Design a protein with these regions (language model features):
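Functional transmembrane core segments of multi-pass inner-membrane proteins
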Residues: 113-160, 166, 179
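Membrane-embedded alpha-helical segments that form the functional core of polytopic membrane enzymes
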Residues: 1-23, 84-97, 134-154
């Protein structure tokens, strides 16, 4: 059951982060008409910013309820109770906002993907089941984070010109197209 709860928490947080990204890129004007990639709900007028904020709140509440259920199941079995899980959950919520509102525009996207799609979900899921972390788990977490980061890299490569115009300083915008090909 802890692994399923971890998966539900991760899915809920991913949906919340996608909603936050859609809303704040729209509010910042990053989702222009010449944008490549999938259409965005706020930019297309399919959903109002107010409704998107409600969706964000709903997904965060859902994720926090899942997190509380996980804590209830694991509390007392983990070293230090479950305080580490509380900290990880809070970091997930905080960085879901910071990623789009600030950090992705400053070139921190790749590092954050490595942490929040590698170390936290893989290491966290292992930890709540085994009650410890091993070097193998750190390696597996790192590899999973790198695999997921290739999706960000390919999107940033595709969007490099629009990102530059929007003020997004991704690694590919900073270091150029040849670097992007190498990074991928």
């Amino acid at each position: 059951a802890p692994a399923l709860l971890c998966a539900l928490f991760a899915c809920g947080m991913q949906i919340a982060a996608n909603f936050i990204n859609d809303l704040y890129d729209y509010l910042k004007g990053s989702d222009r008409a010449d944008r490549l990639g999938p259409e965005r709900a706020c930019a297309q007028g399919w959903i109002t910013p107010t409704a998107m904020k409600r969706g964000i709140a709903g997904m965060l509440i859902f994720s926090c309820l899942i997190g509380c259920t996980l804590l209830q199941q694991c509390w007392g079995q983990l070293p230090h109770g479950g305080w580490g899980l509380i900290l990880l959950g809070l970091l997930c919520v905080i960085f879901a906002f910071l990623y789009t509102t600030l950090l992705s525009y400053k070139g921190w996207g790749d590092l954050l993907v490595l942490v929040f799609f590698g170390f936290i979900p893989v290491g966290g899921t292992y930890y709540v089941q085994a009650h410890s972390i091993t070097a193998d788990v750190w390696v597996a977490s790192f590899i999973c984070g790198l695999v997921i980061d290739t999706l960000l890299v390919v999107n940033n490569y595709r969007d490099r010109e629009q990102d530059a115009l929007s003020g997004k300083r991704t690694l590919i915008v900073r270091f150029g197209e040849p670097f992007g090909r190498y990074l991928y």
